[in-house]
Amino acid sequence: FRSDNPLAMNLYWETSIYWGLLFLKQGGEKDLSDIPLMHEGMRRCIELARTKDWCRLYGQLRDFRQISVGNALEKLAGSILPSADEEQIPFVWRIYRDRPQVCYSLASRLLHEIYVGGFREDSYLPSYEKLSEQFGVSVSTVRRTVKTLNQLGAAQSINGKGTRIFGIGEPCRVPDLKSPSVRRNLAYFFQAFELLAYSCEAVMRDTLDAAAPGEKRKLLSQLQEAIETGNTDLTLWQCLLFMANHSRLHGVRTVYKNIYGLFLWGYPLKASLVNGPEPIPSILHFTKSTVKHLRENDTEGCVNALKTVVAQRFSTAEGYLLRCGLQPEELRLTPSIRLLITDENT
């Protein structure tokens, strides 16, 4: 858990609100919304941060989580039985606020369709009206989203023709780094990559252990095809989608689908570089290793291969972003943290 990663902190608060732990009384005494209790913990953290005592700060955050959230979860597990007759309320991870949530979520869906989905063989997007109908959003939302894709460099609107799109392997336009939305989402891409780096080991192990044989055979087939066609650029995405689609935990699937969506924002930056990076040998080695381990049903081999390549690619991605002009402090932009639960219809 990285407390200096704003996206990780956003996820922490979102899951805490979803569980309702912020509003639970503990032993009839204090609760997590107790302002003096929260201020006391915050003061200790601030003091440790001022003195740059990072080890003790990490311990303070860990202890607070265990004393509060950990104890609350244990109490819930022992006193509340799940109801088999009621449908569970799914966890929804809201990274953005208000309209940007719809616009940026649609942008991620369109990027998926452009790179690996239904638009991957096309040169132009469907009309605004068709996209509006297909994705269930207003035409004005489609228009704002396409503008964002233009700024990102993944698309180019041409008067009288439509919106040109640039698929995998095609050089695309240079992202407009003057656009706040582009810079913000590239920061989220970086933060999502870091979340993946710290969590993929446990998630991949659990997913492989729980996945049906047919699901693992499908992943093996995808990776084999990538090697045969010489197109291994997407194999990390395929593993990410495997976890997002087949984890046994709904919450993990939700989180990893969001990580995948944020991942897509980073591709146009790489594809736009005039003297772009050479194909990274590690990704081909990773693909071949994973194929071997899947054939041998070697879960730990797959997990270690994924962990290694994600760490390597994360370091490379950070270098890309810094060389393209983003500042280190920008990569830590604070996403919205919803501290109040409001009526969704208001």
Model-derived segments and their meaning:
Residues 84-195, 346:
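Short linear motifs at protein or domain termini
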Residues 28-86, 269-346:
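C-terminal all-alpha effector/ligand-binding and dimerization domain
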